[in-house]
Amino acid sequence: MFEKLELTRLAQSLAAHSGSRLAVIARNVANADTPGYRASDMRDFRDLLDQPDVALRTTRPGHLASAGPDPAQGLILSGGPMSPNGNDVSLDLQMQKAVEARQSHEMALAIYRSTSAIIRTSLGRNA
């Protein structure tokens, strides 16, 4: 039932994007001392939504639904200043990005919970 609501699909896509972004950030932190490693990040969720191929809609039951933007399309290089060993991972920057991704994920979950509560209340189920 919830997957038919645009708001919940958007919240699910935001949660998936945030999870993918956290995985990229974790990979950056894990390679902070690897010589020659270049830090990467995900493109902004809003930018991924603005892509024309993401706006596909299912108009008939036989159509396959898209789960949202493809996280692999959003990878970009985004490091800090280059160190002598060719590594550009800034741990401070990665921690800041991790906090942003966590906040986005929490916002997506809050939207999903609020939508669920509204639907339950409208159906007369207060639990």
For the regions a protein language model found, what residue spans apply to each?
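Amphipathic alpha-helical polymerization modules
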Residues: 1-127
